[in-house]
Amino acid sequence: MAEKHDVIDDIIDIRDGLGRLLNPLGGLTGSITDPAHVERFDPSDYKEKPRPNSIFCLRCSASSLVDQDVAVRTCSLCLDICPVDAIEINKASVRVKDNCRMCGLCTMVCPTESFIVQRLMARQLYDKIARAASTYERCYVTCTRALGRLPRENEVLLPCVGAVPRELWLSLIADFDNISVYLPLDICDRCRTTTGEDAYTNEIATAEKWSQASVGFEANGRGLNHEQARAYRRGQFMDDMRQAGLTALVATNSAPAGAQAIAKKIRDHADQLYDIQRSLEEAVGDKAASGHRRILTQKRKTVLGMLQLHPSLADRMRLEVPVCDVTHCTMCGICVRECPVNACDLDRQGHFSVKAAYCVNCGACATVCPENALTMEACDPRELVVRDVEAERRRRSAATQEERLKGAA
């Protein structure tokens, strides 16, 4: 249902129309007078070779704990998804060779985030897509091959759409209903990143199954919508009026300024993720029994933030965590040493436990267990719903204040 058009919208339309009349060439004037300063599209500007960190690599960790034939079975996700076999793992080291296509698929698939590409990290990518989705009627996620030009502000350009993990898709479509993938038909058939199409279809399908929401799809470049969202345009207009000193008009329409409101939304999301980590550390401890600090990956942190706002979605998720058969466990501790995020615990009494919120569900601990005492079983995803301690404190404070007011009356 369309939003009601009022006098504020009419004024905005008139202002925009006058702006186009007064400056019909827009940004073309500068390029005509000085062609050297024209920004040109270069796909390499949106690509970056991943930096591997062997400390968090599951196979590297296993190489120092078990035989090599067992170590190679712990994880091969990056090797399997790389379209040009550019990743080389040799015992305790990981190397990305020079034939890397810089597609970013290894960063998406690695459960422990062993491959670092700054622009593809979950936090940065969420902020970029969320900002575009909040500002415009539609936000498009696409790749350099599909777009072939400089992106507009509501187009998020990636080396491959498959670089977006399911955790990020889940968090985004739970919060926004205007995100689409733009890929012309058959564009992936001619791409040398041969594993990219399967990657993005699997990740999006899983996120849609868990969220019961959907990602849009656009194959026609001429059908892309670059209109700014009504709420954003109104917010920006009111901010312009505020700066111009027209306080009377602003007083009757106190909508938050568009850019400021979106910036606040992004900051609030970052603050929420920080509070979640702090709440987890207070609830289960920031260190494992071994004394090592627990690590919360960016992808997992994004999911926890989404579930805190939409706890009902937890019931649709299916995640597996290790479960210990105490009759087989010899307390050797290999499982604990294998876990790179320190989600596994083995206390002095021999009790094995796992913190589901930190566990990345890789199954490496079960693979390296010499006695096969660990098996991966479905966990209760509601364990991933982190209490919002600060919100609960505010509610208690408000309830106490209300009772005092009633008592005074």
Where are these regions (language model features)?
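Ferredoxin-like iron-sulfur electron-transfer modules
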Residues: 37-74, 84-102, 120-126, 223-228, ...
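Flanking helices and flexible, charged tails adjoining ferredoxin-like Fe-S electron-transfer domains
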Residues: 1-48, 55, 64-70, 105-226, ...
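Proteins enriched for Cys/Gly/acidic motifs involved in redox and nucleic-acid/cofactor modification
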Residues: 31-34, 247-257, 301
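C-terminal segment of N-terminal export signals and the immediately downstream linker at the start
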Residues: 232, 251-294
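Short, cationic motifs built from Arg/Lys/His that form the positively charged side of catalytic pockets
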Residues: 100, 106, 233-235
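N-terminal secretory signal peptides and thylakoid transit peptides that target proteins
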Residues: 225-252
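Cys/His-rich metal-chelating microdomains
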Residues: 60-63, 78-81, 85, 103-116, ...
